[in-house]
């Protein structure tokens, strides 16, 4: 999916994060209990979301595919620092994970990476909004609710992937 992205900020920042954290990204669970709580769960969760997003981006031309893909790939990457995954089986929350959370942690990481890439404009703000809004509602842990179509889509795809995998696990 990254190869389908047009050259520019979103592709550059995604490539920078994947290059830096590739091993952790592909082996880390997406959660400790609720969904994708298994080895490589984070990568599977992201892949499921990207597959569905591709259909929506084809269907709705107003969507910025690069922003959607970048938002999906990075939305839970803060979990690499929110939870430990020492033995690839059990996860525990780090102190920073408990006190700050993966959303705030990822926004800080995007700020740092954007500075390194020398791109801190509107695209960076939109990407941070994707991260901040992906839980959808304030009461579900989002500091802001989605304010653009791309953020709304990422929120719903996050919910669908999480719920379907939880149901699939329950029925096994």
Model segments located where?
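Acidic/His-rich, divalent-metal-binding segments that scaffold phosphate/diphosphate chemistry
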Residues: 1-97, 137
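Divalent metal-dependent catalytic cores for phosphoryl transfer on phosphate-bearing substrates
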Residues: 55-170
